[in-house]
Amino acid sequence: MKKILLVLVLFLTGCVGIPENVKPVDNFKLEKYLGKWYEIARLDHRFERGLSRITADYSLRDDGGVRVLNRGYSAKENEWKEAEGKAYFVKGTDQGYLKVSFFGPFYGSYVVFELDHENYQYSLVCGPDKSYLWILARAPEMKKDVMDKLVAKASALGFDTSKLIFVDHR
């Protein structure tokens, strides 16, 4: 029984880890990060497959956490899909390192590792390993030079940016 509990604890802890060589941003200001973000690009995952016009809205929860509302359009089903979750800081509130849950007690990492600290207009986010990557912006389009910079940073850290899916917001 102790072995099973240990394996479970290690598994759950691993889900909120940080990929090798990735460092969450410091001087993170949640109040500036709140609001609507557009998903510009991502690595493929089942839960977003086939969706376009994807956004994430972040707002404060009564318990001090963050309400996460992800939304995307499925052309195949001709309808909007939504998922609501909750996020909490893993360490200090000034570090871009949170854990997010969309179902039950299971959390995954939400690591902001690149950010426009001045205006909070773009961010580079990953999950617990390098198969999770998102490029987010405050507008549905991003300048090419900014996109190139973010893709280069992710690539240098070992993310397979050749597999990025660029989200259609039309």
Q: Could you tell me what each predicted segment is?
A:
Residues C15-R170:
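A beta-rich soluble binding module of mature secreted/lumenal proteins
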Residues I4-T13:
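Sec-dependent N-terminal signal peptides
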